[in-house]
Swiss-Prot record:
Protein name: 5'-methylthioadenosine/S-adenosylhomocysteine nucleosidase
Family: Belongs to the PNP/UDP phosphorylase family. MtnN subfamily.
InterPro entries: MTA_SAH_Nsdase, Nucleoside_phosphorylase_d, Nucleoside_phosphorylase_sf
Active site: E12 (proton acceptor), D203 (proton donor)
Cross-referenced PANTHER family: 5'-METHYLTHIOADENOSINE/S-ADENOSYLHOMOCYSTEINE NUCLEOSIDASE, 5'-METHYLTHIOADENOSINE_S-ADENOSYLHOMOCYSTEINE NUCLEOSIDASE
Species of provenance: Colwellia psychrerythraea (strain 34H / ATCC BAA-681) (Vibrio psychroerythus)
Pathway: Amino-acid biosynthesis; L-methionine biosynthesis via salvage pathway; S-methyl-5-thio-alpha-D-ribose 1-phosphate from S-methyl-5'-thioadenosine (hydrolase route): step 1/2
GO biological process: L-methionine salvage from methylthioadenosine; L-methionine salvage from S-adenosylmethionine; nucleoside catabolic process
Lineage: Bacteria, Pseudomonadati, Pseudomonadota, Gammaproteobacteria, Alteromonadales
Length: 243
């Protein structure tokens, strides 16, 4: 199988790009797609840029032009689970938009017309991520906690208390918030491609400043990149089950 790996920012994909073998790059529509192998697994890596539109466009090209079999969205996120700390990991059990509201027309909060309220990752990808986390905890030399939970997406970096309070009220089980995952998931659904979103926490939403986000982004990038490598190892030589 060929994996498509998407990160929004350069630090979120830099480690994986450095480890590519048999690498070649292709420019298309303003994106650079890096093809090659990671520990013997065929991959295509792209830095999408920040936000929903950029992420959806990069995903569509990745799937349609490079024919990847599944998509892994890796990177950083703000934590909403009080039991988690910077560097801990959230694997998507579902992904939703937190900045969409068409409830006046009978839709659930976060739901777009002709789409589900929640985008569901592939079970095999979630299972591989969980096994990869076990490996990461054993090799990282620190206690990295991981949960499987709701990840929400919107074009907002949450530092305002009113934004945090609204998100908590609308999505009380939310474990993490970021700016690309649901858009990637929507593109994957449209193009019938399995996905999973994996995020390492770089800050705690509503409590930390952008300065703290930048300070801890490297930690999050290291952990999420290693998890992707572990996950690829778990999936090597396997075929995903029917969704």
């Amino acid at each position: 199988m060929k994996a498509g790996i998407i990160g929004a920012m350069e630090p979120e994909v830099a480690i994986l790009k450095e480890k590519l073998t048999d690498a070649k790059s292709t420019e298309h529509a303003g994106y650079t797609f890096h093809q090659g192998q990671l520990d013997g697994s065929d991959v295509v890596i792209v830095q999408s840029g920040i936000g929903k539109v950029a992420a959806a466009l990069a995903t569509a090209i990745l799937i349609d032009r490079f024919q990847v079999d599944y998509v892994v969205n890796t990177g950083s996120a703000g934590g909403f689970d009080a039991s988690l700390k910077v560097g801990d990991i959230v694997v998507s059990s579902e992904v939703r938009y937190h900045d969409v509201d068409l409830t006046a027309f009978g839709y659930e909060i976060g739901q777009l017309p002709a789409n589900p309220a929640a985008f569901m990752p592939h079970d095999d990808l979630v299972a591989a991520a969980k096994k990869g986390i076990e490996q990461l905890s054993q090799t990282a030399g620190e206690n990295i906690k991981a949960v499987t939970g709701l990840i929400t997406t919107g074009d907002t970096f949450m530092t305002k208390e009113e934004d945090v309070a609204k998100a908590r009220a609308n999505f009380p089980t939310m474990a993490a918030v970021e700016m690309e995952g649901a858009a990637i998931a929507q593109a994957c659904l449209q193009l019938k491609t399995p996905f999973v979103v994996i995020r390492s926490l770089s800050d705690i939403a509503g409590k930390e400043s952008p300065h703290t986000f930048e300070e801890y982004l490297e930690t999050a990038a290291v952990n999420s990149s290693q998890l992707v490598l572990n996950m690829l190892g778990q999936l090597k030589g396997k075929v995903l089950s029917a969704a």
